From Swiss-Prot:
Belongs to the MIP/aquaporin (TC 1.A.8) family. It is found in: Cell membrane. It catalyses: H2O(in) = H2O(out); glycerol(in) = glycerol(out). GO terms for molecular function: glycerol channel activity; water channel activity. It comes from the Eukaryota. Induction: Expression is relatively low at the spore resting stage and increases steadily from the induction of germination to a peak after 180 minutes, at the onset of the polar growth stage. SUPFAM superfamilies: Aquaporin-like. This is Aquaporin-2. Water channel required to facilitate the transport of water across membranes. Contributes to water uptake of spores during the early stages of spore germination. Aquaporins AQP1 and AQP2 act as extracellular pH sensors and enable the spores to hydrate under favorable conditions and to commence germination. Wounded vegetables and fruit present acidic pH, so the optimal pH range for germination is adapted to the relevant host pH. A motif (NPA 2) lies at residues 266-268. It comes from Rhizopus delemar (strain RA 99-880 / ATCC MYA-4621 / FGSC 9543 / NRRL 43880) (Mucormycosis agent).
Length: 317
């Protein structure tokens, strides 16, 4: 989308008006700059102001026009990317606070509240543009049960994965000194000095794979129920506050059954940060530890999302 043709240059951007506010210094379209330093000879600098101003205006207009066109062509991708980046940055930030807290006053309540608030802020950022999926499980369930265009599915999931990876990288750039202070510069996945859990989700060692899968499937199914129910056109009391209701749902699910799996419900939220840790010093073992547990948050939420969408479509809608 191009800029409106009926706007003048100064109306489009007040910054450009500065080119037109120097006329009092111009004589016959030429501008003279005089060095008034009494200790040095006067120096006259001559340049054609109209040519310079026109060139800069033209370059700036082209940049703005191309930026606007790029944004309009990819606005849903950008919204999902930025929304997921914020979600992961804040969610993992809460995990970092819990892991690196020298007081050792860890609380699952704090982690659960952090997850819910992070989802709320991510939806606030992206919801009005892309719908605020921020989760491949939601995107796939919407495609299967709600008529979401299949051509957009790969684009949404790609944006979510890239946003999650970027959010983890941004957080690492902030908390890296604290991590190095905590683990003495030796990156560990699990154990007392393990820090990979800041980014990826890891269940307690005593939890079996079956229990973790059940937690992710049931939790994501309930999340999809909340998303679809609060988004129904006839559910006005909750539709107007859908973002807050989804955030409350995430917090509640986390408090009730999230601890057994490390709580993901979102393949992008786990895979993006896990991939980052693999290249940032923790090594490829982040994908193989705990009997290849990385496969659970990668695929179980998708199954849960489909189950939740099926239950809503068949029994509720």
């Amino acid at each position: 989308m191009s800029l409106r043709d009926d706007l003048t240059i100064n109306e489009r951007d007040p910054l450009l008006s500065s080119f037109d506010q120097r006329q009092e210094y111009n004589t016959s379209n030429n501008t003279y700059k005089v060095n008034n330093n009494s200790n040095e000879p006067s120096v006259l600098t001559l340049y054609n102001s109209d040519e310079l101003g026109t060139s800069q205006r033209s370059s700036y207009q082209k940049f703005v026009r191309r930026s606007q066109e790029f944004k309009m062509q990819h606005r849903e991708f950008l919204a999902e990317f930025i929304g997921t980046l914020i979600l992961v940055l804040l969610t993992c930030g809460f995990c970092a606070e819990q892991t690196l807290n020298i007081e050792k006053s860890k609380s699952w309540l704090t982690s659960s509240l952090g997850s819910g608030l992070s989802v709320l802020i991510g939806i606030c950022v992206a919801g009005h543009v892309s719908g605020g999926h921020l989760n491949p499980a939601i995107t796939i369930a919407f495609w299967v049960f709600s008529g979401f265009p299949i051509r957009k599915v790969p684009m949404y999931i790609t944006a979510q994965l890239l946003g999650a990876f970027s959010g983890a990288a941004l957080l690492y750039s902030i908390v890296e000194p604290a991590i190095s202070q905590f683990d003495h510069g030796k990156r560990q996945i699990l154990g007392e000095l393990g820090t990979a859990g800041i980014f990826g989700t890891y269940p307690p060692l005593y939890v079996g794979t079956g229990s973790a899968v059940a937690s992710e499937v049931v939790g994501t199914a309930m999340l999809l129920l909340v998303v679809m129910v609060t988004g129904h056109p006839n559910n006005l009391p909750f539709r107007t506050a859908q973002g807050a209701m989804i955030a409350l749902g995430v917090t509640t699910i986390s408090l009730c059954i999230g601890y057994t799996s490390g709580f993901s419900l979102n393949p992008a939220r786990d895979f993006g940060p896990r991939l980052f840790t693999a290249v940032a010093g923790w090594g490829i073992d982040v994908f193989t530890v705990h009997h290849y547990y990385a496969l659970v948050p990668m695929f179980a939420p998708i199954l849960g999302g489909l189950a939740g969408g099926f239950i809503y479509t068949v029994f509720i809608d």
